[in-house]
């Protein structure tokens, strides 16, 4: 294995500053502001986020998924409930999201607990997807070994021959909603003196969010 270092791979961050006076008092509103900017300014996949879960042995696991809905109740994504991800969530509902937009020198960390969305919500979203995406969700045993891609392609072709009326949302597929207890907004700044602000509730019954500037 060749030895590589990337010490010289660096750049200065200078897109914008983030001051306390700039922040919304509600982190959901602050998230909305930054997401709208990302959708306008970034090239693609502004809604992509890292979802981190923890397995029973304490091992963290991360993967990229797409945010599909967010509101004052939380952040929703869809997946296979029997996948490694789904099994980890069954064992430990605590999870973390991470959004990163390099064009804006921004990232957002969000922590909280996951729960399944109502079945009708999953079904409504499933039927809004393109047919090939619906079929892929139906035939995939996500995270399980498969001998070759040819097997997957054959299963997809077989499924495509079925009448559309037979296409239903699989019981093993649906949405999760993360209910946040923690937000952190990070804005890259020159000389690595980044701006970081944390939103945190002091207790479960506290509706207000405490905002704190953090050292970079």
Curated annotation (Swiss-Prot):
Textual note on the cofactor: Binds 1 FMN per subunit.
Biological process terms in GO annotation: pyridoxine biosynthetic process
This protein's record includes keyword Nucleotide-binding: no
Binding site for substrate: 10-13, 68, 125, 129, 133, 192-194
Superkingdom, natural source: Bacteria
Pathway assigned in UniProt: Cofactor metabolism; pyridoxal 5'-phosphate salvage; pyridoxal 5'-phosphate from pyridoxamine 5'-phosphate: step 1/1; Cofactor metabolism; pyridoxal 5'-phosphate salvage; pyridoxal 5'-phosphate from pyridoxine 5'-phosphate: step 1/1
Molecular function terms from GO: FMN binding; pyridoxamine phosphate oxidase activity
Residues annotated as binding FMN: 63-68, 78-79, 85, 107, 142-143, 186, 196
Cofactor(s) demanded: FMN
Pfam families linked to this entry: PNP_phzG_C, PNPOx_N
This enzyme's EC code(s): 1.4.3.5
Catalytic activity from the UniProt record: pyridoxamine 5'-phosphate + O2 + H2O = pyridoxal 5'-phosphate + H2O2 + NH4(+); pyridoxine 5'-phosphate + O2 = pyridoxal 5'-phosphate + H2O2
Function: Catalyzes the oxidation of either pyridoxine 5'-phosphate (PNP) or pyridoxamine 5'-phosphate (PMP) into pyridoxal 5'-phosphate (PLP).
Similarity-based family: Belongs to the pyridoxamine 5'-phosphate oxidase family.
Protein name stated in the entry: Pyridoxine/pyridoxamine 5'-phosphate oxidase 1
Species this protein is from: Hydrogenovibrio crunogenus (strain DSM 25203 / XCL-2) (Thiomicrospira crunogena)
Lineage: Bacteria, Pseudomonadati, Pseudomonadota, Gammaproteobacteria, Thiotrichales
